[in-house]
Amino acid sequence: MADKEAKKVPSVPESLLKRRQAYAAAKAKRLKRLLAQKKFRKAQRKIIYERAKAYHKEYRHMYRQEIRMARMARKAGNYYVPAEPKLAFVIRIRGINGVSPKVRKVLQLLRLRQIFNGTFVKLNKASINMLRIVEPYIAWGYPNLKSVHDLIYKRGYGKINKKRIALTDNSLIRKRLGKLGIICMEDVIHEIYTVGKNFKVVNNFLWPFKLSSPRGGMKKKTIHFVEGGDAGNREDQINRLIRRMN
């Protein structure tokens, strides 16, 4: 009888059983969550790929449309006048010691607080007037798709909780702009380049670009571009300056 009692397996304490059950439940819950996240990421990658493909098609159509319109105008013996640009890229090229408060205020509104800071600006009557006020202190023009793409991918930082955060992951964009349907870098580029309905929100999300000093230096910062200097509107030639500074 004593031998039987000695061989009897001791019962597992109830508290230990509960801990094991809780651990197993937590593990199952964690695995389920990881599986759901994996499935979500896969679906997001597919959406991003499809959007990138659609944007590429749209950009190609826009380019071909311009070529076609110019060709038709030439054929009819006319000059083709492209539509007024809607987007500018503005770079601050000079300091502001001793300048008027008005100039200082406009540079702050454009978020150009440091030399070689750059920002995108939606062109309208009000913004063009602002650019004219600070023209001696800035270089600006009309960026092409490559410039917008390269700036955002190479020097794109987001304003997240008032901090400058590198946009290394689409999840950062999705968390801040997902409610607008903007979930990836290609969405940001498209919204900026086409000056979409959410341009202001997306542009404010982007931290001002911190560019490098241009390779080869600046010629004459105080002289307008049309007179052989660096300041003012250089239209599509801004793309060459962006390449030198990016």
Swiss-Prot record:
In terms of one coarse class, where is the protein primarily found?
cytoplasm
Q: Which SUPFAM superfamilies match?
A: Ribosomal protein L30p/L7e
An MF annotation (GO) of this entry: RNA binding
Q: Which cysteines are joined by disulfide bonds?
A: none
Q: Which residues cross the membrane?
A: none
- Please, which domain of life does this record's source organism belong to? Eukaryota
CDD domains assigned: Ribosomal_L7_archeal_euk
**sequence repeat intervals:** 7-17, 18-28, 29-40, 41-52
List this protein's GO terms for biological process: maturation of LSU-rRNA from tricistronic rRNA transcript (SSU-rRNA, 5.8S rRNA, LSU-rRNA)
Keywords for this entry?
Answer: Acetylation, Cytoplasm, Repeat, Ribonucleoprotein, Ribosomal protein, RNA-binding
Where does the record say this protein resides?
Answer: Cytoplasm
At which residues is N-acetylmethionine found?
Answer: M1
Q: Which GO terms describe its cellular component?
A: cytosolic large ribosomal subunit
Matching entries from InterPro entries are given as: Ribo_uL30_ferredoxin-like_sf (IPR036919), Ribosomal_uL30 (IPR039699), Ribosomal_uL30_CS (IPR018038), Ribosomal_uL30_euk (IPR005998), Ribosomal_uL30_euk_arc (IPR035808), Ribosomal_uL30_ferredoxin-like (IPR016082), Ribosomal_uL30_N_euk (IPR012988)
Quaternary structure and partners: Component of the large ribosomal subunit.
Please name the NCBIfam families in this protein's record. uL30_euk
Q: What is this protein called?
A: Large ribosomal subunit protein uL30
- According to its UniProt entry, this protein's organism is Gallus gallus (Chicken)
